[in-house]
UniProtKB/Swiss-Prot annotation:
The keyword Ribosomal protein applies. One of its GO terms (cellular component) is large ribosomal subunit. This is Large ribosomal subunit protein uL10. The keyword Ribosomal protein applies. Part of the ribosomal stalk of the 50S ribosomal subunit. The N-terminus interacts with L11 and the large rRNA to form the base of the stalk. The C-terminus forms an elongated spine to which L12 dimers bind in a sequential fashion forming a multimeric L10(L12)X complex. Coiled coil: none annotated. Forms part of the ribosomal stalk, playing a central role in the interaction of the ribosome with GTP-bound translation factors. Pfam families: Ribosomal_L10. Gene3D superfamilies: 3.30.70.1730, 6.10.250.290. Belongs to the universal ribosomal protein uL10 family.
Length: 172
């Protein structure tokens, strides 16, 4: 990579850090190419990205972003996972790390908040934005369904009383 390519890469990575909702930094020493491809594929399917960058370039790219506090995590063989949804990158990275011991989560950032490895894991346990929306819609729909059942119940009860009265008169 010559200087111009490095400048372009740093500018691109800086933009990715600024736009992302969360960033996860992990060591990937010992991961095979197939495992790394699997991680990239899972992250892409979830709406995130995985990037391996030189530590020096990643630290430069972090300057001027909210995630600048995680620059100290870039030592050794590091991989960066990021996504616009704050829950996506931590969730996919933690799930992958559970299956592959060689991916070791070092920490990350969500906006200006710097997270340690435990913080990333607890963030991964939260429901995603889509799951929260589904729960909210369910909460809104439930009272409406109950109201519909309650308003139709008296009519059904009246019909049953009239039917029972009619059967009683026929029997007599």
């Amino acid at each position: 990579m010559d200087r111009a390519e490095k400048r372009e890469f740093v500018a691109w990575l800086n933009g990715a850090f600024k736009e992302s909702g969360s960033v996860v930094v992990a060591h990937y020493t010992g991961l095979t190419v197939a495992q790394m491809s699997d991680l990239r594929s899972k992250m892409r399917d979830a709406g995130g990205s995985v990037k391996v960058a030189k530590n020096r370039l990643a630290k430069i790219a972090l300057q001027g972003t909210e995630s600048e506090g995680i620059a100290d995590l870039f030592t050794g063989q590091t991989v960066v996972a990021y996504a616009n949804d704050p829950i996506t990158a931590p969730k996919v990275a933690v799930e992958f790390a559970k299956a592959n011991d060689k991916l070791v989560i070092l920490g990350g950032a969500m906006g200006a908040t710097t997270l340690n490895a435990d913080g990333v894991k607890s963030l991964a346990s939260l429901p995603s934005l889509d799951e929260l929306r589904a729960k909210l819609v369910g909460m809104i729909q439930t009272p409406a369904q109950r109201l519909a059942v309650l308003t139709s119940a008296p009519a059904g009860q009246i019909a049953r009383v009239i039917g029972a009265h009619a059967r009683k008169n026929e029997a007599a």
